[in-house]
């Protein structure tokens, strides 16, 4: 990313960009760390569902951080989306320590999205996204060295390196840069709903690529999430429009 945006990054090298970008990186690190630790103590489905609760939390985070107006459409869409994610991902209703940790991660995801939406409109989003990656990378490296067992050199095969490069560049750098650019141009509540499509998209690719069964429950979840996005974007105004009188 530095190779592409180095001129802008160097030109905008100041304390404000560093503080905002590194702060966003710290929020992202906390969110992913809690999500990962929580996953070790709960099921994958519950982890995905509870992480998806950020779609409800983002409107409140944006309200407190930037005064973004809360509307009944935002809240209704968030609840509808959460119900859809529940149908797609939730496999039980028991609550344990892993669920609580995962929910903490969702809080940090919501704050990070609200911060990105607030400052992305005022600052160069590419620059602060670069510093976000730097902050997240430093904290991830330190925590990995402190708490993780380091893999032997034998695992670094050409195939493993290609997979890691795809995950690091394509699924992380490119995806999060696009996400941040989008959040800088839409309300945070709308952005969080669109990002919640990650859950049904994961299931959809599991169906297409891995042969997972597509059940009526999954279809119902997809429909609810899709309806939540339509509600947020259109308020279903097209259903209330009066037909034009014919001459």
Regions from the PLM with identified roles:
Residues 1-30, 57-61, 108-115, 130-148, ...:
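Transmembrane alpha-helices of multi-pass small-molecule transport proteins
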Residues 1-6, 54-76, 200-219:
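C-terminal transmembrane-helix exit sites in multi-pass transporters
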Residues 1-4, 74-80, 97, 101, ...:
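Hydrophobic alpha-helical transmembrane segments of multi-pass integral membrane proteins
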Residues 2, 70-89, 106-109, 140, ...:
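Hydrophobic transmembrane alpha-helices of multi-pass small-molecule transport proteins
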Residues 3, 160, 195-247:
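C-terminal-most transmembrane helix of multi-pass membrane proteins
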Residues 6-51, 85-87, 168-186:
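Specific transmembrane alpha-helical segments of multi-pass solute transporters/efflux pumps
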Residues 26, 34-37, 91-118, 138-140, ...:
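Glycine-/small-residue-enriched transmembrane alpha-helix faces in small-molecule transporters
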Residues 47-53, 116-138, 168-208:
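Helix-helix packing/entry segments at the starts of transmembrane helices
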